A protein has these predicted regions:
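Long, intrinsically disordered low-complexity tandem-repeat regions enriched in serine/threonine/proline
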Residues: 3, 14, 36, 61, ...
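Short, charged, amphipathic alpha-helical segments
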Residues: 37-43, 121-131, 149-150
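Short amphipathic alpha-helical heptad-repeat segments
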Residues: 9-22, 92-107, 123
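Repeat-associated, polar segments at repeat-unit boundaries in modular proteins
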Residues: 45-86, 134-163
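Asparagine/serine/threonine-enriched low-complexity, disordered tracts
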Residues: 4, 8, 14, 30-32, ...
């Protein structure tokens, strides 16, 4: 995912969503893989935090903005995200895929709204919308966000260690 300008960043953002969907589909097709809604959240937050790093968005700023917006609003849903998914009617992965579709619909609605108003349709707002939807999903499914983000950090740390080991192995072969 190469990111240079704002347009490219938006393209990369939507590519990231497609990659999340592809990763989940791939894991579902693998007979040896068991996938739950929690793993889907780990995949999504992993991709989202990596994207933020690539486009130099401070992820903690997104978290802080979300916390502030939660304090100031009185239960309203200004983004138009439908968090009414009935988790009892779906398995966890189907419910998560439905939520991803909801994110895409929310982003499309926001883009239309931006064309009519002075709001900016950029990668920061897209990240914030996705983050908000994922956090609302965590709340709805009673997933502990702090533990989830710790798991994402551990995953990223392990991937970095693996990447470093591969580089060292490649150097020693030459």
């Amino acid at each position: 995912m190469q990111v240079n300008g704002e347009g490219n960043n938006l393209d990369a953002f939507f590519e990231m969503i497609d990659l999340i969907e592809d990763d989940i589909s791939e894991m579902l097709e693998n007979e040896n893989s068991e996938l739950s809604g929690y793993e889907c959240l780990v995949i999504s937050f992993n991709c989202l935090t990596l994207f933020c790093r690539q486009v130099e968005i401070d992820f903690s700023q997104i978290e802080d903005h979300f916390s502030e917006s939660e304090k100031t609003k009185s239960g309203e849903n200004s983004l138009g995200f439908d968090s009414s998914i009935d988790l009892k009617e779906h398995n966890e992965v189907e419910a998560f895929n439905g939520m991803l579709e909801g994110i895409e619909n929310t982003l499309a609605s926001f883009e239309k709204r931006c064309k009519k108003t002075d709001e900016l349709f950029d990668e920061w707002n897209c990240v914030f919308i996705m983050y908000t939807c994922l956090r609302k999903y965590c709340d709805k499914t009673k997933v502990n966000y702090g533990e989830l983000i710790d798991d994402v950090s551990k995953l990223q740390s392990n991937l970095e260690k693996e990447k470093q080991t591969e580089k060292e192995d490649t150097k020693s072969l030459n």
